[in-house]
From Swiss-Prot:
Domain of life where this protein originates: Bacteria
Pfam families in alphabetical order: Ribosomal_S13
Keyword tRNA-binding: yes
Keyword Ribonucleoprotein: yes
One annotated GO molecular function: tRNA binding
Record note on quaternary structure: Part of the 30S ribosomal subunit. Forms a loose heterodimer with protein S19. Forms two bridges to the 50S subunit in the 70S ribosome.
UniProt xrefs under SUPFAM superfamilies: S13-like H2TH domain
Cystine connections: none
Identification of the protein by name: Small ribosomal subunit protein uS13
One Gene Ontology cellular component annotation held by this UniProt entry: cytosol
Family assignment from sequence similarity: Belongs to the universal ribosomal protein uS13 family.
Keywords annotated in UniProt: Ribonucleoprotein, Ribosomal protein, RNA-binding, rRNA-binding, tRNA-binding
Biological process, per Gene Ontology: translation
Length: 122
């Protein structure tokens, strides 16, 4: 099983699809990496040699932030927004939508399950 950036790539999938299983690598980035290394995107991960996988690994490490490094950067950016007390940071802190979406109705994904009205006690 091929392993890149700490992720086991799925067997039997095309190489561009398999690379997109890595956090921070989508289809476009996967195609760019494969093109830079000179591997056809339609080849299966199983068909790639250890040397080719090593070239892909080196290309990702050299030119792209993926997995843990990218996750740390994103969380540090959000923490910085919260520390400086800007509007976006306050929205993150309160767990509300950040990009100006409506919250009177909707926004259930960010706000969590509904808090039901407290019923009359008998």
């Amino acid at each position: 099983m091929a392993r890149i950036a700490g992720i086991d790539l799925p067997r039997g999938k095309r190489s561009d699809i398999a690379l997109s299983y890595i956090y921070g690598v989508g289809r476009v980035t996967a195609l760019k990496v494969l093109d830079a290394v000179g591997i056809n995107w339609s080849r299966s991960i199983d068909d790639l040699s250890a040397e080719e996988l090593n070239e892909v690994r080196k290309e990702l490490e050299k030119n792209y932030k993926v997995e843990g490094e990218l996750r740390r950067e994103v969380s540090a950016n959000i923490k910085r927004l919260m520390d400086i007390g800007c509007y976006r940071g306050l929205r993150h802190r309160k767990g509300l939508p950040v990009h100006g979406q409506r919250t009177h109705t909707n926004a259930r994904t960010r706000k969590g399950p509904r808090k039901g009205a407290v019923g009359k006690k008998k």
